[in-house]
């Protein structure tokens, strides 16, 4: 009877730990985007990453991103606020303006760089949504 209980316990542990083990880890954003290797991200590095993602997301190559291309990176309300001409799309400049706003929100010490701790904050995670 004890052996059966042990087997059940081991199987339960395996079942419940499998999803955690199978879940892919996200790459370290500092390592991904820190082109000068100083251990932080500055606005230029963030904008470079955002520009690259913009080009990748712009599947129809019209120079804008609509809600479908943004794939949930911005809520409808955020998209409307970031869209000064109210055409339902963001140009690269409009997208980078949102990126800069989120960068500034994630940089409470105003030192011009984001470290790992700042990127883990809610504002930092919101910024990372626009880079990945």
Protein language model features and the residues they cover:
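Bacterial N-terminal signal peptides that target proteins for export
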Residues: 1-8
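Bacterial N-terminal signal peptides
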Residues: 8-17
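EF-hand Ca2+-binding helix-loop-helix modules
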Residues: 21-56, 67-81, 92, 96-102, ...
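Acidic carboxylate motifs that coordinate Ca2+ or other divalent cations, activating on Asp/Glu
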Residues: 34-38, 58-62, 85-87, 107-111, ...
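A mid-sequence interfacial segment
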Residues: 110-127
């Amino acid at each position: 009877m004890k052996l059966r209980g042990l087997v059940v316990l081991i199987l339960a542990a395996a079942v419940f730990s499998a999803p955690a083990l199978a879940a892919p880890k996200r790459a370290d954003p500092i390592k991904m985007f820190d082109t000068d290797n100083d251990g932080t991200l500055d606005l230029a590095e963030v904008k470079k990453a955002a520009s690259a993602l913009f080009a990748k997301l712009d599947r129809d190559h019209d120079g804008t991103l609509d809600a479908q291309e943004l794939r949930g990176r911005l809520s409808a309300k955020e998209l409307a606020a970031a869209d000064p001409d109210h055409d339902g799309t963001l140009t690269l400049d409009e997208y980078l303006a949102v990126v800069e706003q989120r960068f500034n929100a994630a940089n409470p010490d105003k030192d011009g760089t984001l470290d790992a701790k700042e990127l883990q904050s809610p504002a930092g995670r919101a910024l990372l949504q626009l880079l990945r």
